[in-house]
Amino acid sequence: DYLIGLRKAYPYASYITINISSPNTQNLRQLQGADVLDQLLNRLKLEQTQLTQTHGKHVPLVIKIAPDLSDEAITSIANLLLKHQIDGVIATNTTITRTGVEQFSVSKEPGGLSGAPLTQQASKVLGQLHAVLNNAIPIIGVGGIMSPKDAQDKIDSGADLIQLYTGLIYHGPDFVREIVKAVCSNPVHSN
């Protein structure tokens, strides 16, 4: 499926996300295991090389990982991304944990949890990826960005870019402007 999707989207895409972390797709997260991921990344990279030649353009591949990984698994994934020269990583998808929301009846429903309960967990994964990758590939920080401060924290933890989901739903399109203004006013990131 990934190879078919890659072939179909490649001519039209600016970049392609390979999501191996959706909690809503049965058994998908098993693809984050070292042996399976190694094989998948190898096949994707070979296909990307062929498609680059066919279409005369390089479309970056970005791997989206889960926040519910052990430190060992995060390090293993980071090393595989380096080994296969993957173009970027998205840290992270939604979580299957329900820490901090156990009191709500909806917490027992299946699927991924996003928003504020995810902030710290996603930032922890981002920080660990940053430490292992050492700026070798871009990291897109996502997960629990509910304020301009959260966005700045992602950048400070090693994100090269950020993505918004739940924060955008709650705050609307002006949320993007608020974040850009806050980040640009930070002397460290004024360029």
Describe the residue ranges of each PLM region.
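Structural preference for beta-strand elements that scaffold enzyme active sites
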Residues: 15-17, 58-62, 87-90, 138-140, ...
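Glycine-rich phosphate-binding active-site loops on the catalytic face of alpha/beta enzymes
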Residues: 20, 88-98, 145, 151-178
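Glycine/Thr-rich beta-alpha phosphate-binding loop at enzyme active sites
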Residues: 24-32, 36, 80-135, 175
